[in-house]
Amino acid sequence: MTQTRQTEKQIRSFIAIPVPDEGIQSLQAVVQDFDADIGRHVRWVRLEGIHLTLKFMGNIPAGMVDRVLADLPTVTAKFSPFKVGIFGFGAFPNLHQPRVLWAGLDGDLATLASIQLAVDDAVGNLGLPKEQRYFSPHLTLGRVRREVTDGQLRKIGAVVSAAKLAVSPSWTASAVNLMRTELDLAGSRHYLVGSATIGGG
């Protein structure tokens, strides 16, 4: 009887645009204020782990990760670097029933949406599922714990809707990163697999 080939290692992975240090620093003060008011109801994302997700792929074979990385420069070479900034705060699905807290974005959102679509198409051409949801660019800050009351949800929504940045940073998006995620008891940790320059080069 022929022995079955060992299952290929699976890697939890996603494609994202990195957020520079000044963007992370501007969010830090807001998250600290959030934490003082509603922290016991929210699991916060590590600040160093905040990123602008273009495509979440989940657990995929290691060989597929290599193929995605090989194709990524072809996608990003079709675009030019563009401006993006942090603007406003909100929650999914809404501020009345907040479950995911986020920072919003402004800038050249048309180019951002085009890159996201091109990335999704490229990944789909490799045989991975294409995104079914509308692309809503954001930076995830935290996730509301399940054991909260309606009153606590209302308070969370009110705190988030009133938040403002002292400085609204903007930057030039010039790279798209392929990342892998490792899960531990403290949450998720993200590691760079490879990067592709927007505009080529």
Can you name each region flagged by the protein language model?
Residues T2-G201:
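Histidine-dependent nucleotide/RNA phosphoesterase domain, centered on the 2H-phosphoesterase fold
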